[in-house]
Amino acid sequence: MTATQKKRLTTSAMIASIAAEGQPTQPAPFGHALVELARQRQDIVGLTADLSKYTDLHLFADAYPDRFFQMGMAEQLLMSAAAGMAREGFTPFVTTYAVFASRRAYDFICMAIAEENLNVKIACALPGLTTGYGPSHQATEDIAIFRGMPNLTIIDPCDAHEISQVVPAIVDHQGPVYMRLLRGKVPLVLDKYDYRYQHGKAQRIRSGKHAVIISSGLMTMRALEAAEELEKRGIDVGVVHSPVIKPLDEATILKEAGEAAIGGRLVITAENHSITGGLGEAIAATLMRHGVAPRFRQIALPDQFLAAGALPTLHDQYGISTSAMVAQIEQWILS
């Protein structure tokens, strides 16, 4: 193989870890955090729809087999059973893929769980473009679907460090929670910034004098990587991490965007989700309601069904890789 030839990607790259080569990772942070939490609290039960291994719930099943319920490929039944358990005083942690929760089980989450404001925690793997298996498995519109559901809190953690903190934080939050789950070997990013998850809060991770990126989920990792590369090019970009999409931390968003507007800085939202109905639109609506009008741009997935293929290729193609972000932001800043 010559220096100019790229390594040929195989089908395993369709489900590859989002971690960059050599990046520190932590295996199954959700599963390990839930096992530890269940050791302290007898009310916690785990339910899944034939996906325990692929949502890291198998660790809970091994540790507490009498508190684990395998519901089979029946997501609607899964949510109904969780609702019933919550009504009896249990705290169910439910796992499946994000596409199945948002598309197939929506009505059951809405009527059985959210309307009753039950204490059910729904953790869903393969959010956004974290699989190359095509539209049947890519939950690129899950936030848009769930944002309009009353009582439902939506969380999009960045990395293993944050997931480990979100799990114990949400168990005491009264009401249903939908968490976008990164599983397997999950990158460690925010520990380098002494970050601590604060439920309901967005936090500035890095300051910048030319632009600020407001991001969630894995895009905060990408935003920080892009900021480091842009700094080498003389462009100073700040990063604000907003893990809770709903209810949005409007106070922090307005403060950061307001300061950017006064200073003439660009505000950029970055999300692993369709450009329609996600974090970017939520922030844009907040700014409009309050009369804050900075220069504003979005980095997001297009409003279309996406292709199948190797994840690194797809992330480049759809503009959410670090290199694609760097090129786009540099163009915006210099134009």
Protein language model regions, located:
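Thiamine diphosphate
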Residues: 1-180, 185-186, 196, ...
